[in-house]
From Swiss-Prot:
Name of the protein described by the UniProt record: ATP synthase gamma chain
UniProt-listed NCBIfam families: ATPsyn_F1gamma (TIGR01146)
Organism lineage: Bacteria, Bacillati, Bacillota, Bacilli, Bacillales
Top-level taxonomic group: Bacteria
Annotated gene: atpG
Gene Ontology CC terms, in alphabetical order: plasma membrane; proton-transporting ATP synthase complex
Bilayer topology annotation: Peripheral membrane protein
Source organism per UniProt: Brevibacillus brevis (strain 47 / JCM 6285 / NBRC 100599)
Length: 287
């Protein structure tokens, strides 16, 4: 009986230590979530201004003819897949990877028809183990990434489209809704849809050296900015999912502690009752 009580006590201590860790991880994830939300908000005006200028140029007769705005016969498709480097984030990685695999299976019959640009160690390991065709990868991103952290892989993907090595490019990530809701999303990045110009707020710009050259310079930057915006959303989704997972783990640990504490108290009561019974039996035997 004493051995069983000691084991329950050790188990309670272990669960309390685990609860302390998961509670701390939940708080850290909440702080990182807010940081990435703020960063996404800060980056939005830059993307909006580029979009405004592109819409102004593309509304002209020559702008919409740029190759990055034109559909062409699809021989090969590229996918930029955003995952995390770390686990303990609930279904964050599994959900987007399942979505990507289903999309690939529906659209392609051969591995020659597509290639994957992967961000995050979890995605890299997943696709590598299953021999999916990887075109480029980046891992080890900071929890609050800067644009420079993904400039290389985003630029490489856009360059392959411009060089007609791929004919369409999709962006795959967990779209942030709230801390408890993230939507696995696969959306077309290239060819870009020309942003619609708001005539009520239209501004007449003068472009040097020409509107066509400005557009040619801005479109790749705009595509890369969309990748960065998706990355920030994905990071917010990751921390939201991790915060929820750690919150659930903390609640489960509390439930286990309560059940173990009840078992511990019952075991102690049984041990005390048995000890009293033995004392009484011994006293009666001496009488």
């Amino acid at each position: 009986m004493a051995k069983g009580i000691r084991e329950i006590r050790r188990s309670i201590k272990s669960k309390k230590d685990m609860r302390q860790i998961t509670k701390a991880m939940k708080m850290v994830a909440a702080a990182k979530l807010r940081r990435n939300q703020d960063k996404a908000e800060a980056a939005r005006p830059y993307a909006d201004k580029i979009q405004e200028v592109i819409a102004s140029i593309a509304s002209g007769t020559s702008g919409s003819k740029h190759p990055m705005l034109q559909n062409r016969p699809v021989k090969k498709t590229g996918y930029i897949v955003i995952t995390s480097d770390r686990g303990l984030a609930g279904g964050y990685n599994a959900n987007i990877l399942r979505k990507v695999v289903n999309t690939i299976n529906e659209k392609h019959k051969s591995k020659d028809e597509y290639g994957i640009f992967v961000i995050g160690r979890k995605g890299r390991d997943f696709f590598s183990k299953r021999n999916y065709p990887l075109l480029d990868e980046v891992t080890g991103l900071p929890t609050s990434p800067a644009f420079a952290d993904i400039k290389k892989i985003a630029g490489a993907a856009v360059q392959m489209f411009e060089n007609e090595q791929i004919d369409e490019l999709y962006l795959c990530y967990n779209k942030f809704q709230s801390a408890i809701s993230q939507i696995p999303t696969v959306k077309q990045l290239l060819p870009l849809e020309a942003p619609e110009s708001n005539n009520a707020r239209a501004i007449n710009y003068e472009y040097e050296p020409s509107s066509e050259e400005v557009l040619a310079d801005l479109l790749p930057k705009y595509a890369e900015t969309l990748v960065y915006s998706a990355l920030l959303e994905a990071k917010a989704s990751e921390e939201g999912s991790r915060m929820t997972a750690m919150g659930n783990a903390t609640d489960n640990a509390t439930d286990m502690i309560n059940r173990l504490t009840l078992s511990y108290n019952r075991a102690r009561q049984a041990a005390i009752t048995q000890e009293i019974s033995e004392i009484v039996a011994g006293a009666n035997a001496q009488a």
